[in-house]
Amino acid sequence: MASTALSTASNPTQLCRTRASSLCKPVKGLGFGRERIPRNITCMAGSISADRVPDMSKRELMNLLLLGAISLPTFGMLVPYGSFLVPAGSGSNAGGVAAKDKLGNDILVEDWLKTHGPNDRTLAQGLKGDPTYLVVESDKTLATYGINAVCTHLGCVVPWNAAENKFLCPCHGSQYNNQGKVVRGPAPLSLALVHADVDDGKVVFVPWVETDFRTGDNPWWK
């Protein structure tokens, strides 16, 4: 009896490992039941190289991206056990979540302000695992809003450039002012906002559903 063998060369979609995860798609080749022909594989990088991001170490960026990547697929599995796994008080502010630093620890506002000066913008883990900037005001207080770091063009993480007092996207050149309002395309919209509340000394990110104070418009991210 004849048997049919499944070759990995006939798999229509393959994954490869690079510095940034990439999706590899075959450019040429035949399907099942035909003569095998060597395939050319084209890898299209799905994210940018960390060494192109200014004012932020590679380790910090990769830690935050890894946290976000891990949190999304595991969240659904953990929901039924959330009351056992989430510390008391976490996420109690109308759908809010405790802000996490690059090591995954809760951010204590008093300690944060001791190590982050005026006009600082530093990434934390925010709602849905998105990298989100905590903002320190010029008077050394924590701003009541945080800024989602995901570019509204194609989803790159946008670094803060203190020298230019702007968020500058390294992917396609979009620019945002120091509050995350878009000032140069191709990004069509400003960076999303979240509330940065303080609960029992910890920073808590809460969804922003009110008018965007930067534009006077309803929030596009609702």
From Swiss-Prot:
Its cofactor is [2Fe-2S] cluster. It is found in: Plastid, Chloroplast thylakoid membrane. The chain crosses the membrane at residues 66-86. Disulfide bonds join 156-171. Keywords: 2Fe-2S, Chloroplast, Disulfide bond, Electron transport, Iron, Iron-sulfur, Membrane, Metal-binding, Plastid, Thylakoid, Transit peptide, Translocase, Transmembrane, Transmembrane helix, Transport. Its EC number is 7.1.1.6. It catalyses: 2 oxidized [plastocyanin] + a plastoquinol + 2 H(+)(in) = 2 reduced [plastocyanin] + a plastoquinone + 4 H(+)(out). It is a single-pass membrane protein. [2Fe-2S] cluster binds at residues 151, 153, 169, 172. PROSITE patterns: RIESKE. Binds 1 [2Fe-2S] cluster per subunit. Gene3D superfamilies: Rieske [2Fe-2S] iron-sulphur domain (2.102.10.10), Single helix bin (1.20.5.700). It comes from the Eukaryota. GO terms for cellular component: chloroplast; chloroplast thylakoid membrane; plasma membrane. Residues 1-49 form a transit peptide. GO terms for molecular function: 2 iron, 2 sulfur cluster binding; electron transporter, transferring electrons within cytochrome b6/f complex of photosystem II activity; metal ion binding; oxidoreductase activity; plastoquinol--plastocyanin reductase activity. One of its GO terms (biological process) is photosynthetic electron transport chain. Residues 109-205 form the Rieske domain. Component of the cytochrome b6-f complex, which mediates electron transfer between photosystem II (PSII) and photosystem I (PSI), cyclic electron flow around PSI, and state transitions. NCBIfam families: Cytb6fFeSPetC, PRK13474.1. This protein is 1 of 2 subunits of the cytochrome b6-f complex that are encoded in the nucleus. The Rieske iron-sulfur protein is a high potential 2Fe-2S protein. Belongs to the Rieske iron-sulfur protein family. The 4 large subunits of the cytochrome b6-f complex are cytochrome b6, subunit IV (17 kDa polypeptide, petD), cytochrome f and the Rieske protein, while the 4 small subunits are petG, petL, petM and petN. The complex functions as a dimer. This is Cytochrome b6-f complex iron-sulfur subunit, chloroplastic. It comes from Triticum aestivum (Wheat).
